[in-house]
Amino acid sequence: MGTVVIVGTQWGDEGKGKITDFLSQGAKVVSRYQGGDNAGHTIHANGEVYKLRLVPSGVLYPHQLSVIGNGVVVNPKSLVGELARLAEQGVTGENLRISDRAHVILPYHIKLDKLQEAAKGADKIGTTNRGIGPAYMDKAARVGIRMADLLDKEIFEERLKANLKAKNEEFVKVYDSTPMNFDDIFEEYYQYGQQLKQYVCDTSIVLNDAIDKGEHVLFEGAQGIMLDIDQGTYPFVTSSNPAGGVTVGAGVGASKIDRVVGVAKAYTSRVGDGPFPTELLDKTGDFIRNAGHEFGTVTGRPRRIGWFDAVVVRHSRRVAGITDLCLNSIDVLTGLDKVKICVAYERDGERVENYPASLKFLSECKPVYEELPGWQEDITKAKTLDDLPENARRYVERITELLGVDLLTFSVGPDRDQTNVLENVWDKVSR
């Protein structure tokens, strides 16, 4: 048996897609287990740039199965479009499997997402307006429509009518907005379901069979742990559980998980609103944003930038049970005279070592920094830690010391051959 979970340790955009693509070379199955098409990631492979939102990274390799688990909320329109774009790049998608238990995002979810966000005004969460939250709300309220329902014309019609009636009343009475048309949604989305029908199955069986056969299975988390609805900066979070969602979102037992790989950038970024203790609002932040091309894959929005926050990543390590660390984008910091690491917070003269649940408490905290000398040398061709200039190497070593976790890989650029392996995670699960 060999299973590895990949999770983001910050607020998403840590480079999980790249690491998933890299580690998937040793996997037979790659599966997503939560989130939706709000979680874009970019993969550079075979001289092509692939921008994925719903489809797992393994779809690029015909010998692997790519699984969208039951914990993912699926926008059929978005998924059909993504598969069409991949086909234009020569990726067939024949190795894709979609859980029949995955919930479906429909147009009324997207409309409700936008109306709810607009109604909050200055208190908005900063969602991607893709209907993720409302779809998970329907799931929790037990009125959601699943992939299995979408494929059954009679069931889909019955449930869509009931749901749309309730949603239209909400649109008109609560938000003073126009109702949506049943026929338009029904015909369009039933056809999307028929186009996806060939991929739909009980993916829990697929995953557990692969694990029981001793095959390597890689689970790909979306967003980051600081966006986890339970462990993140609530309410400025997503609607799912990147931290521990793999067991329920993929339908595999906790006893079948071997390693949890945490992915972090050598600095911090965030899209949307919410607390960000190490945020840089000066020219240093602009330098890092431009050097790192820090603009959202899905939204195109400039990401907020800050120094590496060890308090955040230690919190993520603890709540997700992280066993190994992948550190990305070290090269982005090249050219800075000094670099900083947040090692703790300070509040009213007292040192705070752990990330607080109260956002009011957090707003009263100031970061405590360690300052290290920067480096000017080009590190994009480095293959080992010894190839790094002394200051860059010391920066990496200090991060791992503060986190108390072994470094699995470090990256000095966006391409796959710029990800350098210190230890093969698949060797670890085979021991």
Swiss-Prot record:
It is found in: Cytoplasm. It comes from the Bacteria. Mg(2+) binds at residues 13, 40. Substrate binds at residues 297-303. One of its GO terms (cellular component) is cytoplasm. Its EC number is 6.3.4.4. Pathway: Purine metabolism; AMP biosynthesis via de novo pathway; AMP from IMP: step 1/2. GTP binds at residues 12-18, 40-42, 303, 329-331, 411-413. IMP binds at residues 13-16, 38-41, 128, 142, 223, 238, 301. The keyword Cell membrane does not apply. Its cofactor is Mg(2+). Gene3D superfamilies: Adenylosuccinate Synthetase, subunit A, domain 1, Adenylosuccinate Synthetase, subunit A, domain 2, Adenylosuccinate Synthetase, subunit A, domain 3. It is an enzyme of class 6 (ligase). SUPFAM superfamilies: P-loop containing nucleoside triphosphate hydrolases. This is Adenylosuccinate synthetase. It comes from Lacticaseibacillus paracasei (strain ATCC 334 / BCRC 17002 / CCUG 31169 / CIP 107868 / KCTC 3260 / NRRL B-441) (Lactobacillus paracasei).
